[in-house]
Amino acid sequence: MVQLTLPKNSRMRVGKTWPKPEGATNVRRFNIYRWDPDTGENPRIDTYFVDMDKCGPMVLDALIKIKNEIDPTLTFRRSCREGICGSCAMNIDGGNHLACIYGMDEIKGDVNIYPLPHMPVVKDLVPDLTHFYAQHASVQPYLITETPTPDKEWRQSIEDRKKLDGLYECVMCASCSTACPSYWWNGDRYLGPAALLHAYRWIIDSRDEATGERLDSLEDPFKLYRCHTIMNCTNTCPKGLNPAKAIASIKHMMVDRIV
């Protein structure tokens, strides 16, 4: 039988339990992953109690309340607070969500919060997305043309423009890629659902003139074909997009140009 031994500093330990708010009757318990690279200590799970009668309805509201009123050392990303910027993606109650639009009423019992899976951690709930962004850049997510730029806009029919619906709305939160087991196993070479969704968005753009080159760049055993239609990406996308369908469409295009 294979035996695996985790590095000593990877084992999570029980952290600090903060006191409950006095006089509160509607209290939720939050178990939150904590790790500070500057201390050299193991990751830990700290426990906080929040008076929900004095807190907004979203998970991000509770995190902000914890940081402002209980523990200012808690670190996480956030910005727009309305599901547009993608900054506050994290693993909540076992699934990847945007904390700003994930309601407390969707969670039963304790609230368990971790950083996005698979990614290196910068600190606490902040993942290092350097590799994720590099993969996105590798698909050249912009218009490539040889035709001289027109005096006005690049014209596009209503039908061609409609093909981009369900693709351009991605907020680059990384929830889909970090929910994908294939990305966990082959993240160094498999581009992942987010990057491939963007690749398809430009491949089918009627104004783009580099379709062949884009498909050539994806003709690789790992970049595209490590997708095994597990569908975690589609199930977890906070914008309701379907990266798995986009990936399947690219595969069909690969076959169509050969047959």
UniProtKB/Swiss-Prot annotation:
Binding annotation for [2Fe-2S] cluster: C80, C85, C100
Name the EC number(s). 1.3.5.1
Domain (2Fe-2S ferredoxin-type): give its ranges: 28-119
State the reactions this protein catalyses.
Answer: a quinone + succinate = fumarate + a quinol
Q: Which GO terms describe its biological process?
A: respiratory electron transport chain; tricarboxylic acid cycle
Binding-site list for [4Fe-4S] cluster:
C170, C173, C176, C237
Q: Name one GO molecular function term.
A: 2 iron, 2 sulfur cluster binding
| Family according to the record | Belongs to the succinate dehydrogenase/fumarate reductase iron-sulfur protein family.
Q: Describe, as the record does, how this protein assembles with itself and its partners.
A: Part of an enzyme complex containing four subunits: a flavoprotein, an iron-sulfur, cytochrome b-556, and a hydrophobic anchor protein.
The protein's name in its UniProt record? Succinate dehydrogenase iron-sulfur subunit
The species is Paracoccus denitrificans
